Amino acid sequence: MLNSLLPADWLYLERIVRFGETDSAGVIHFYQLLRWCHESWEESLERYGLKAADVFPNILNKEKQPLVALPIIHCEADFWKPLQTGDHISIELLPKKISAGSFQVTFKFKRGDNYVAQALIQHQAINSQTRSCCELSTKINSWLAESLCID
């Protein structure tokens, strides 16, 4: 583990629905849910102890690129209840390793005691230079392994 936190510290997050994330009816635009998923995953990695620069490419610094890139190869979302401006929501991340080179994260969105949406995003590891499939990085493997220890 990169820090002394428990998995719940990096797998349970919160946010508030902002006005700019909604349409004229005050309900979130559908694509915001997938944006929130990615932001939640980034925050989870940061809370775990992984720096963004160790995981995500930096177009401005070609010399300090991660060897492994993690493009999204599949995503899906289900909406059960509308989310509106000002709603306080909790987001639970449920990572799962699929193979030596891929993993997925299920995101469960809850308002109060009610689940309002769920999404899934799958990533495939590729060599950032050759663009061919490869194994996940040690750091992502550690995040996955320790995330699966949650009760």
Curated annotation (Swiss-Prot):
UniProt keyword terms in alphabetical order: Hydrolase
Pathway membership, UniProt: Cofactor biosynthesis; phylloquinone biosynthesis; Quinol/quinone metabolism; 1,4-dihydroxy-2-naphthoate biosynthesis; 1,4-dihydroxy-2-naphthoate from chorismate: step 7/7
Gene Ontology BP terms: phylloquinone biosynthetic process
Alphabetized InterPro entries for the sequence: DHNA_CoA_hydrolase, HotDog_dom_sf
The reaction(s) this protein catalyses: 1,4-dihydroxy-2-naphthoyl-CoA + H2O = 1,4-dihydroxy-2-naphthoate + CoA + H(+)
GO molecular function, one term: 1,4-dihydroxy-2-naphthoyl-CoA thioesterase activity
Entry protein name: 1,4-dihydroxy-2-naphthoyl-CoA hydrolase
Organism listed in the record: Prochlorococcus marinus (strain MIT 9211)
Pfam entry (one): 4HBT_2
